[in-house]
Amino acid sequence: MRDFSEPVAVPLLSGYEAKYLLSLVRCGEVDVSLDLGVSTSKGFVCNEGVSIDDVRVSRWMLEKAAARPEDVYVVEERFPKLAWFEEKMYRLVAPGWRQPTTVEINGVRMHRTVVVNPMDDARQKVMLLRELGGAEALDICTGLGYTAIALLANGARRVVTVEKDPNIVKMATLNPWSRQLFTEKIERIVADAVDFLRKCGEEFDVVMHDPPSFRVAGELYSTEFYRLLYRVVRRGGVVVHYVGQPGVKRGFALYRGVVERMRKAGFKAVHIPECFCVRAVKV
């Protein structure tokens, strides 16, 4: 069990940003974002490319990036895509121009990106917890940290967030939209969620549980896991469990099994269809 490393500040260019810069007709001063939309700086665009302080983005870089708008590139000589393979394929994705990013694992996105952006998606889930003033909050499966950030922003006194996959941890350190994750009020732990819960007492008022798909991490949808959750949540505490809607076109409803197993573990659980979540209270 260890803490995340610190964030790494590197200039990043999305294909959407490149398309925007290439669309500019006149040379001159322009607002440019090299942190995927978190902020902008004054740059100078011309036929050869764009210059922002001491960073130069050549025209061939812009053209390469613009061909794949959702990809993210590191602005350096080789201009690599922010993606790598380590047993699985990991890729940072820009779902829109200057919008919060998501991460893709083997082609599957870890956030909703249609209708709602990933950051707003996390905020909507956290709103299901209702009152957070002074709460001790647990966030299971950190991902890029948007849920932990939203928990703190909505009034949690302290947030503990747990992530098992070191590649996702690495991606969070590189993602500009994850910077607010790295604060002393958020305790960042790299560990298996089951092992972590076994070491906890009854110490959390609220829990956000946003696991990978059932196919990938079935143990995080089990009765045994929900019993561990029940043990660490204080009486009257709330768990919000994102389940999505896998198999819905085939008539399969994952949430029904989740509700049944959470009730079996002792929770009063209901499905919240508009957020694809199950909300459970320890009674």
Predicted segments, located by residue:
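Conserved class I S-adenosyl-L-methionine
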Residues: 133-143
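Conserved beta-strand signature within the Rossmann-like core of class I S-adenosyl-L-methionine
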Residues: 236-244
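Conserved SAM-binding motif I beta-strand of class I
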Residues: 158-163
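Conserved SAM-binding loop of SAM-dependent methyltransferases across substrates and taxa
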Residues: 144-156
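S-adenosyl-L-methionine
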Residues: 164-201
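N-terminal auxiliary segments of SAM/dcSAM-dependent transferases
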Residues: 1-96
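A short glycine-rich, Lys/Arg-flanked "PGG" loop and its adjoining helix->strand segment in the class I
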Residues: 221-235
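Class I S-adenosyl-L-methionine
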Residues: 247-283
